[in-house]
């Protein structure tokens, strides 16, 4: 029997791992990449390309290397825990080379349309029209994996800012920003306090005369560096922490988180405290913002009510004159124009079962990969989604009925609406551990902690209290990797390695990652006791 041919659209993080997932399942991938290289979002270019994600030169990833790597290919131990975008791209190049992925990619090829074949209800096949160097080609595929991301179309709500058309200074979306040199000596307003808004305000404040950071709601600011210097996602992303947070309930979780965040700096005093709870919005990750605020180089302001030719008037009645530049860090919209009616997106809302499969198709041969915004890394989620999708394409896994899928989609949407503030930013939100565990169950690779407690208690303990790293989903089941156990048990060694650039005698009483976790759990238990008794 001939191999099923699968179209993979995009060769960023999701696209690369999906090519590999196809190969693991004996499928034949053909990847279409509109640019001339891999990397997607993480390939920096001085001039942004239309239809392609764009980053600024200084971008550091917000998730640590142990949490963001692909499950069977750890990031080299000497790489920093939080990598510069150039190092992320280099990791992707190593991954592509290691698994021989490049030969399956057709560069400078744009996907024009993806349509059902006339016999789709029985064949599940798709007609894919592509264009390369001005010439169109039509191919038929047995499945399609859409890996185009959700950071390509800038959301620029100019209608919400009266007077912007009269403003004589420069204004643009944060997607166009590259470096702070051109803002030297200028007065700059950054609108939006997501990760990009915070980063830009901090970086520009090193050259600008004054930076104003405008926010509608405020934000809770999370540091990359946690207790004892461990990466914050390493400390927060464990199964035991996840179990306890469910037991404690949302009110106690939020109270505890807000107390921890305010110990670093008082969000109310700094003008950042929002009305929503700490977990009611995706937190902003920024290590330097409080330092720039307390130095007066960044001033936090409310929402802009209107612009004049040279000034901004805020909703509290205050005014800032002689504004030179306005940067809209207002996020992104996403769409799939080449899919026509197969996947409908309305105000950044889309109906996908488990955030992957459109529920209305007669055959489950189309999957959207990486369309999720977790408090954690997207790459390993994309990988698990790809592993699941290729199993479904191959017929190894089945999906529920359309009505069952829609019921779950609506239930998830209602839960997200209750938890998060109404925002374009929260339409594809998902919890990192819950999402990973859920899909791992579907793939058949979720570790059995109870069984391991008897056969390998050391490993079971690490899986329970240690960080929920991607490599844990290579311990058993399809795609099992022989190096998984050792990689899990040496996680702390790789965290420490890039920091040991000066030889220091290690204190035998020093605090290990496990000790830090036990202390955190003890504090959490105490918080529960105090809250309820």
From Swiss-Prot:
Major site of localization recorded for this protein: membrane
- The lineage's top-level taxon is Eukaryota
UniProt binding sites for FAD: 10-14, 33, 41-42, 62-63
Give the record's keywords alphabetically. Answer: Endoplasmic reticulum, FAD, Flavoprotein, Lipid metabolism, Membrane, Methylation, Microsome, Monooxygenase, NADP, Oxidoreductase, Phosphoprotein, Transmembrane, Transmembrane helix
Listed under GO cellular component are:
endoplasmic reticulum membrane
* Cofactor names: FAD
As its record notes, the protein acts as a catalyst of:
N,N-dimethylaniline + NADPH + O2 + H(+) = N,N-dimethylaniline N-oxide + NADP(+) + H2O; NADPH + O2 + H(+) = H2O2 + NADP(+); heptan-2-one + NADPH + O2 + H(+) = pentyl acetate + NADP(+) + H2O; octan-3-one + NADPH + O2 + H(+) = pentyl propanoate + NADP(+) + H2O
Query: Where, per the database record, does this protein carry Dimethylated arginine?
Result: 5
User: What EC number(s) does the entry state?
Assistant: 1.14.13.8, 1.6.3.1
Q: Where in the cell is it found?
A: Microsome membrane; Endoplasmic reticulum membrane
Note whether Mitochondrion occurs among the keywords. Answer: no
One Gene Ontology BP term is: xenobiotic metabolic process
Which parts of the sequence carry Phosphotyrosine?
Answer: 56
InterPro entries, from UniProt?
Answer: FAD/NAD-bd_sf, Flavin_mOase, Flavin_mOase-like, Flavin_mOase_5, FMO-like
Family annotation (SUPFAM superfamilies): FAD/NAD(P)-binding domain
Phosphoserine occurs at which residues?
54, 58, 401
- Please give the family membership noted in the entry: Belongs to the FMO family.
This molecule's function is given as: Acts as a Baeyer-Villiger monooxygenase on a broad range of substrates. Catalyzes the insertion of an oxygen atom into a carbon-carbon bond adjacent to a carbonyl, which converts ketones to esters. Active on diverse carbonyl compounds, whereas soft nucleophiles are mostly non- or poorly reactive. In contrast with other forms of FMO it is non- or poorly active on 'classical' substrates such as drugs, pesticides, and dietary components containing soft nucleophilic heteroatoms. Able to oxidize drug molecules bearing a carbonyl group on an aliphatic chain, such as nabumetone and pentoxifylline.
The identity of this protein, by name, is Flavin-containing monooxygenase 5
| Biological classification of the source | Eukaryota, Metazoa, Chordata, Craniata, Vertebrata
